[in-house]
Amino acid sequence: MRQTIMKVYMDALAGNIGVIRENIPENVRLMCVVKANAYGHDIVRSTLKLWQAGVDAFAVAIVEEARVLRDAGIYCPILILGGASDGSLREAVRIDASQAVYDLHMLDILQDEARRKGKRAMAHLKIDTGMCRIGVRGEDALDEILDHWKQCPDVEMEGIFTHFCVADTDLEYTRKQNEIFKRAIEKARAAGHNPIAHAAATSAMMIPEFQHDMVRPGIGIYGTGVPQLEGRLRLAQQLTTRPVRIQKIKAGDSVGYGRTFIAERDSVIMTLPIGYGDGYSRLLSNKADVLVRGRRAKLVGRVCMDMITADITDIPGVTMDDEVVIVGRQGSECITPEELAEMAQTIPYEIMLGFRARVAMEIVDRYRR
């Protein structure tokens, strides 16, 4: 059995929700984003744990993700954030999931399916305030869809939302987006709707002016991406493996393809069974660390498809039975998605989501030190 395993700690998820709850007002609801298999944390198990922890609602990207939750017997409120085909819109109505809407055709399909099924369709009006992806953009378009909504009596505007594009780097632009959004909320309410307003994802959820009726954290749930809560959130992922070889090499010996590492001294090299075929970026070659016996060991040589190599010369006593941490905590040390993302010239999201199917996942109820 391959010993490269992604452990997901359920108690960390619940604990992170508790920390977030303590830092937002009591009257602000919490919608957790569990798209993309809960950012690589198992969508069904994570959603169940978060629901038990008191989360108000969940968001996914596509109707297929909502269907997975419904098929697992999870009947909590679910919002589908992304665009959708006619068939996907009809499926959203059938499984009682709320759907983001931003044009007249989407409204018409929801209305038709709701009428056919004898139920109410639930929708969240998406406002494009500067992202230029999907959403109602501009006052005229907003007036048009609000007017058209009068012809769709079986579609309830359950929510209204937007998405900030630079909340972590540009507060001034985010405030401009928020002003556009607030005007849209006023218009929707003046038209007779009473939607839940939400805009703040992880980057903005700690800023009171952006919280509205509900916040919508994603990556923060999983233990990262909230500078204001640094040290209080716990990584819910831990990627571990064990050595497949430990060997001594001489000064002048090279390690790996391209001879990119040549030993300057007699060294001890540990080979680990993980590589870019598992989603571990080749850009981490000769840069990243792993943790063994609570200490950092530097990668040497190129990341291969199936293996990486690390220098453990200064860490005595390492054996083939030692657990090696690729992402996560060991002792007082921690390798975070942010750390690896900076080295790989990417974002923490890609690190979290990048590990592939041949990395086994183990759901753990409680972290054991």
Could you say what each language-model-derived stretch is?
Residues 2-10, 14, 64-65, 84-86, ...:
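Active-site anion/phosphate-binding pocket segments in diverse small-molecule metabolic enzymes
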Residues 4-8, 12-15, 22, 26-196, ...:
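Active-site-proximal beta-alpha core segment in soluble small-molecule metabolic enzymes
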